[in-house]
């Protein structure tokens, strides 16, 4: 039985926030038509002009918040800016009608004043130790520093997008598992990372595979800026701001290509399709390896992971996955080289016991599961990654609810407050 928690929660939230104001705004155009039409001879022109202005307003309202106000001042102040505009317009109307002038003026002044007040609009209001909380065109951004690490999250409640260990060592997360790719490649001279983040994997490649050249593509310019300021992204890393697939199309060839372009719970559809992975294969050198990070793994039939594995296996003849211990990530290694996985095993065996990669690579080798492939193929024309991502979150919510039900049944509802 499908629960669709996210769908219903999103629908309920949208109804609560937007139904009443949108219904009221929906009455504006018909009312204007009524008041502006003075003659049946001119009504067609009048209605057309109003509709044209409405269309222009819709276009401005769509693009101005996304590309200007939200990146510049954030979501909360964007709401206040547009509320103030509506309030000022209403004030002008009531002044012309000589009605409710004082009341409208007070509302307009209050909303306008709120825009300039130094409020701390924190989405993570329960956190008191955030180094940075910001928004960009693409992401909510949260930087938190601990004694051992600096962490970037693009989700207000959970998840780690990037991490820097102050000790300079391994992270204990999926980045360590992904280091199997440069170890597996015939040579590791050129590495491309699609979804650089703050450069965790890039820094590890330079540290554990000295001499390699690393290029990282990150679509979010603010994340690149954070990587330099807070995460110590090495200057040797060529950080490119742009879309990963667009960059890949015009780039050269590489020994290792990592695809790690998750945006919150989903992967961009254009970086999940059979056409994309075909392009990746074409940009790999002989003996090259692709590694894909799959976040929020699921064992359910028809999950996002299953779609991605089937899609990749339809392009790469040799694929295997490994589960990240203690996390929800699944790493997939893919190559067109028949000797690739045998070479990985040989190189892992050759690592000395005191080698920093020895333990984690042994864990990777033990956990590798070959991918057989199937018929669940994502294409540029059809890649429902958002729905697949929501399905995984629904599974997580259902699991948590079952845990809570069991706790309440066993210990009572007051146990939740302890």
Say what each PLM segment does.
Residues 101-174, 181-184, 321-418:
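Soluble small-group transferase modules, centered on the S-adenosyl donor enzyme superfamily
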Residues 216:
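Short beta-strand "acidic-cap" motif of Rossmann-like dinucleotide-binding folds
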């Amino acid at each position: 039985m499908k629960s669709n928690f996210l769908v219903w929660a999103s629908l309920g939230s949208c109804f609560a926030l937007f139904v009443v104001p949108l219904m009221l705004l929906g009455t504006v155009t018909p009312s204007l038509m009524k008041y502006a039409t003075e003659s049946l001879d001119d009504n067609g022109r009048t209605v057309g002009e109003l509709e044209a202005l409405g269309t222009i307003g819709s276009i401005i309202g769509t693009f101005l918040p996304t590309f200007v106000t939200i990146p510049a001042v954030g979501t909360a102040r964007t709401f206040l800016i547009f509320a103030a505009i509506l309030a000022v317009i209403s004030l002008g109307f009531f002044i012309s009608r000589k009605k409710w002038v004082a009341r409208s003026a007070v509302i307009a002044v209050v909303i306008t004043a709120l825009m300039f007040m130094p409020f701390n609009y924190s989405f993570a209001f329960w956190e008191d130790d955030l180094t940075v909380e910001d928004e960009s065109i693409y992401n909510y951004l949260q930087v938190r520093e601990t004694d051992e690490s600096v962490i970037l999250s693009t989700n207000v409640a959970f998840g780690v997008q990037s991490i820097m260990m102050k000790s300079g060592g391994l992270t204990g997360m999926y980045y360590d598992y992904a280091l199997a790719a440069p170890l597996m490649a015939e040579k590791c001279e050129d590495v491309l990372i699609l979804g650089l983040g703050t450069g965790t994997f890039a820094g590890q490649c330079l540290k554990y595979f000295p001499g390699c050249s690393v290029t990282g593509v990150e679509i979010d310019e603010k994340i690149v800026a954070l990587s330099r300021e807070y995460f110590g992204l090495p200057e040797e890393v060529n950080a490119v701001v742009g879309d990963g697939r667009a960059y890949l199309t015009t780039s050269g060839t590489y020994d290792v290509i990592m695809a790690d372009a998750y945006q919150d719970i989903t992967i961009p559809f254009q970086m999940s399709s059979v056409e994309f992975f075909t392009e990746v294969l074409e940009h790999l050198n002989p003996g090259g390896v692709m590694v894909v990070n799959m976040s929020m793994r699921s064992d359910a039939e028809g999950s996002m992971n299953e779609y991605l594995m089937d899609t990749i296996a339809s392009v790469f003849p040799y694929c295997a996955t490994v589960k990240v211990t203690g996390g929800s990530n699944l790493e997939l290694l893919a190559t067109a080289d028949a000797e690739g996985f045998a070479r990985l095993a040989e190189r892992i065996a050759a690592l000395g016991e005191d080698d920093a990669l020895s333990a984690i690579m042994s864990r990777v080798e033990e956990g590798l599961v070959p991918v057989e492939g199937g018929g669940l193929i994502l294409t540029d024309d059809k890649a429902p990654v958002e729905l697949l991502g929501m399905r995984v979150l629904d599974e997580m919510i259902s699991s948590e609810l079952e845990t809570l039900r069991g706790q309440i049944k066993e210990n009572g509802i007051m146990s939740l407050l302890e």
